[in-house]
Regions:
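Non-catalytic, usually N-terminal nucleic-acid engagement modules in DNA/RNA processing proteins
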Residues: 1-131
Length: 132
């Protein structure tokens, strides 16, 4: 649930309540594209030192590597990342544009050739939600 705490002109301050914690807005989100921050920052550092409120992960990249089957076997994304705070996952839609040379758009969704190993990947709305 989102609560608007203060507004002045076009600026707003609020908070999201999630089952994994509260996110104060505006917020800076670290991007852990494939469930990890580049540069050797650990989940403990993010929580304790950097006071990170939420982690952003990319659905397409998680699906390609490490793979949603591995994340599932590990007990879900929170356990895989050793992260107990909120996680925001995108739909993978940005890759429709950024990987334009590796994709084909159809009525039912998008077919990609993996940028890692070339394997064929399909992502429609249902697949995106399932991965997330």
């Amino acid at each position: 649930m989102f609560t608007l705490l203060k507004q002045e002109g076009a600026a707003r301050r609020g908070q999201f309540e999630t089952v994994h914690g509260t996110i104060q807005t505006p917020v800076f989100m670290n991007v852990g594209t494939s469930a990890a921050i580049k540069g050797g920052v650990s989940s403990i550092d993010l929580k304790n030192e950097l006071k990170t409120q939420v982690e952003l992960c990319n659905t397409y990249h998680l699906h390609v590597r490490p793979g949603d089957d591995i994340i599932y076997k590990m007990g879900g994304l929170h356990k895989f990342m050793n992260w107990d705070k909120p996680i925001l996952t995108d739909s993978g839609g940005f890759q429709v544009f950024s990987l334009a040379k590796l994709r084909k758009i159809k009525e039912e969704g998008v077919y990609f050739n993996s940028h890692v190993d070339g394997r064929r990947i399909f992502m429609g709305p249902e697949e995106s939600m399932q991965i997330q």
